[in-house]
Amino acid sequence: MITETAYAKINLALHVRSKREDGYHEIETLFAFVDAGDVLVARAAEADRLETVGEFADVLDNPFDNLVARTMSTLPREGGLHVTLEKNLPVAAGLGGGSADAGAMFRIIEQMHGLPDDWEEKAIRLGADVPACVASEMAIGRGTGTDLEPVENDMAGMAVLLVNLRVPLPTGPVFKAWADTAGGEDLGPLPTGTAREIARKGRNDLRPPAVAICPPIADVLQALEATDPWMCEMSGSGATCFALYDETEMRDKAARAIAEHHPGWWQMTGTLQ
């Protein structure tokens, strides 16, 4: 039996550069991963079987057509797998939950059976975030997010607080709103430097269109800003927001304050990998 965490992905910066002819967008982003997320448990079986449990298991559109099931059918191997997916991350939340699940599944199959030589191509076909989620290490992503570059990670161990309104926000409408409301304007490349420098100087170009679609996101950011974090921002296309702290005690104090004043909001704590 193998247990893997599907680490929550956050974008410490996300610059949208242009829309491509194929409909996808050229982006530059700083991927980071939290040491918490969904949990997958796998064991050998005669045939593939996927069981979903956890707080958000019932909101999966089709638990048998999610990225875990698709990963299992994509990677060749001998024998089946019985996989239990504990869905702790909200869906359509900007945390790469499905991609993180797929990344964990790649790591499980690598340990049990090994991966094919073309595994990266298979990962890309499953989703733009999947290659980054397989490694689950801080990296710069370019293109659609699949072209990964190393970055000096001087943020490992920082305390993280994730907060979500419990409102799903699909990626497609946010990118469309970016083109409509921002006119698709390129506001410039990702800064250079260490992870801290990029995160501090960077931006999330999808935050304005996401807030236009879901205005309460601004309330989450305001609540997080009031806890005096090192930085706070929306992750990906939203609606999850994150705050980073140099001290665990500050994060825990912030989490208690958020829970007290906004008991209906979802939250998760962890540290950056």
Swiss-Prot record:
Q: What class of enzyme is it?
A: transferase
Entry-linked Gene3D superfamilies: 3.30.230.10, GHMP kinase, C-terminal domain
Reactions it catalyzes: 4-CDP-2-C-methyl-D-erythritol + ATP = 4-CDP-2-C-methyl-D-erythritol 2-phosphate + ADP + H(+)
Spell out the InterPro entries in the cross-references: GHMP_kinase_C_dom, GHMP_kinase_C_sf, GHMP_kinase_N_dom, IspE, Ribosomal_Su5_D2-typ_SF, Ribsml_uS5_D2-typ_fold_subgr
Q: Please provide the record's keywords in A-Z order.
A: ATP-binding, Isoprene biosynthesis, Kinase, Nucleotide-binding, Transferase
Gene Ontology terms: biological process: isopentenyl diphosphate biosynthetic process, methylerythritol 4-phosphate pathway; terpenoid biosynthetic process
Enzyme Commission number(s): 2.7.1.148
Write out the catalytic residues in the record: K9, D129
What terms describe the molecular function in GO for this protein?
A: 4-(cytidine 5'-diphospho)-2-C-methyl-D-erythritol kinase activity; ATP binding
- Could you say which residues bind ATP here? P90, V91, A92, A93, G94, L95, G96, G97, G98, S99, A100
In which pathway does this enzyme or protein participate? Answer: Isoprenoid biosynthesis; isopentenyl diphosphate biosynthesis via DXP pathway; isopentenyl diphosphate from 1-deoxy-D-xylulose 5-phosphate: step 3/6
One Pfam family per UniProt: GHMP_kinases_C
Q: Which domain of life is it from?
A: Bacteria
Main role?
Catalyzes the phosphorylation of the position 2 hydroxy group of 4-diphosphocytidyl-2C-methyl-D-erythritol.
- Check the record and name the HAMAP family matching this protein: IspE
The similarity annotation says: Belongs to the GHMP kinase family. IspE subfamily.
Protein name listed in UniProt: 4-diphosphocytidyl-2-C-methyl-D-erythritol kinase
**Organism the protein comes from:** Erythrobacter litoralis (strain HTCC2594)
Lineage at the top is: Bacteria, Pseudomonadati, Pseudomonadota, Alphaproteobacteria, Sphingomonadales
